[in-house]
A protein has these predicted regions:
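Short acidic, glycine/proline-rich loop/turn micro-motifs
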Residues: 273-276, 344-348
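Conserved SAM/AdoMet-binding glycine-rich loop
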Residues: 86-87, 95-96, 191-315
Length: 447
């Protein structure tokens, strides 16, 4: 790590900072908190890295490919912008801090997401002891500068022990924010965002550490009552943790709670689910998803799937494929398993050859794309309330991407529109997190 430091006061006044986020919506929120902290100390945020003197990279460690992508980005930025200071934070740096510190291109490493630690890392003459777990909440995020949708982080960390997951090692135990703090932040963000996404690492466990009567359903009910003009969307949530009260809120909200659920599946084989240390069976997942789909219509439905987990046989893969084909998914995030240091799965025998795992992942992605395209086609001619993300694009409540026709529209607003056109042809390729592109329809103002 480059430890050269220049003169100056231990603050960020005058620093021009460019941010890059890898990974999940929780990371997007954390980057915004870093930005807000730095701006409060006098730093300037820039959208062009060529204008920056410091870059903050908020990394992801969900897969081996995610770690590699972050390190490649460090080297590429250093090569193209040799005068740029590089500060690395996030989940990858939490688990691989020593590796980043050994990289000569890196000027500062923050093992985690603490925005104060990031701000101090930008001022190189200040040294801060590393912490494994930053506090949850405490400072309210006023807005999401980089998008028309706002991120509303309600908790961090996870108490489950899935054998494949390194994110829980990086994020620590589940910690919920107080409801009043979340409501106050939602009111601030609602001033500039018409849609707020409830995010975290394990939002289905929201409130378990806060005492009786506080849970995700009660929080959502309070948000819907407090901010009736805002559309709320749930981030990733386990299917078995969606209670009937939450379904009733979604069904009866008139779209104020977006009809969209991302419910991690991981595998359709009970043998593999046991090896993954998941807490549900294939049938429990299947039954709950079908109950949800029967109650909510239309419904954008996504899932995470891991292909090629250690010990996964052809028949296990076939069971996963069959379950995907049975359930009404509209998109999938699929990626081949990769060993994550410190996880139980990294020590399991019977690893599936990489080329077989990659082939299985590609096959499942193609099924997901076919399902998504068919779902998009079924929505043509329907009315949808679209969150305007830019003057030419938006997102429906059921998670369809749309191109906007007609007059330019104001980002950060909601508008009823008629869906039209044919879903754009998609490819089954995916990035480090296995995310496939969403189908794209066209939309025009409703008559």
């Amino acid at each position: 790590m480059n430890t050269d430091s220049g003169p100056g006061a231990p603050d960020t006044r005058g620093a021009a900072v460019w941010y890059h986020t890898f990974g999940c919506k929780a990371n997007q929120y954390d980057t915004e908190r870093m930005r807000q902290e730095l701006e409060s100390r006098g730093a300037l945020t820039v959208d062009d890295v060529a204008r920056a003197d410091t870059a903050v990279l908020n990394t992801c460690t969900v897969t081996e490919a995610a770690d590699r992508e972050a390190m490649r980005t460090v080297r590429r930025l250093a090569r193209r912008h040799p005068e740029l200071r590089l500060v690395v934070a996030g989940c990858s740096s939490a688990l691989r801090a020593a590796e980043y510190e050994e990289m000569p291109q890196v000027d500062g490493v923050v093992p985690g997401h603490d925005p104060v630690a990031v701000a101090l890392a930008v001022a190189p003459e200040v040294h801060l002891a590393a912490t494994d777990e930053e506090p949850i909440g405490g400072v309210l995020l006023r807005s999401n500068r980089r998008g028309s949708r706002g991120w509303l982080k309600i908790q961090d960390g996870c108490d489950r022990k899935c054998s494949f997951c390194a994110t829980r090692l990086a994020r620590g135990a589940s910690r919920s924010r107080l409801p009043g703090e979340i409501l106050a932040e939602a009111e601030l963000q609602a001033e500039s965002h018409a849609e707020l996404v409830l995010t975290g690492i394990h939002i289905g466990h929201y409130g378990l550490d806060l005492g009786a009567g506080t849970n995700l359903s009660s929080l959502v009910a309070d948000l819907l009552e407090r901010l009736p003009g805002v559309r709320f969307r749930l981030g990733s949530i386990e299917a078995t943790e969606i209670d009937d009260a939450l379904l009733e809120l979604m069904a009866g909200s008139g779209g104020a709670l977006a009809p969209h659920l991302h419910v991690p599946m991981q595998s359709g084989s009970d043998e593999v689910l046991r090896a993954m240390r998941r807490w549900h069976t294939r049938e429990q997942y299947r039954r709950r998803v079908l109950e949800i789909a029967d109650r909510i219509e239309p419904l954008g439905l996504g899932a995470d799937v891991i292909a090629g987990f250690p010990g996964e046989r052809d028949e296990d893969h076939a069971e996963t494929r069959a379950l995907i084909e049975e359930l009404p998914f509209t998109y999938l995030h699929v990626f081949p398993w990769s060993p994550r240091e410190g996880t139980h799965a990294a020590s399991l025998p019977d690893r599936v050859p990489r080329e077989i795992a990659a082939g299985r992942a590609l096959e499942l992605r193609e099924i997901g794309i076919e399902a998504g395209t068919a779902y998009a086609a079924s929505r043509v001619g329907k009315l949808a309330r679209v969150a305007i993300e830019s003057r030419t694009s938006g997102l429906t409540g059921d998670y369809l991407r749309v191109r906007l026709r007609g007059a330019n529209r104001e980002p950060g607003t909601l508008e009823w529109m008629t869906l039209s056109g044919t879903a754009t042809d998609l490819k089954a390729g995916a990035g480090a997190t296995g995310r496939a592109a969403l189908p794209v329809l066209e939309a025009a103002a409703a008559p």
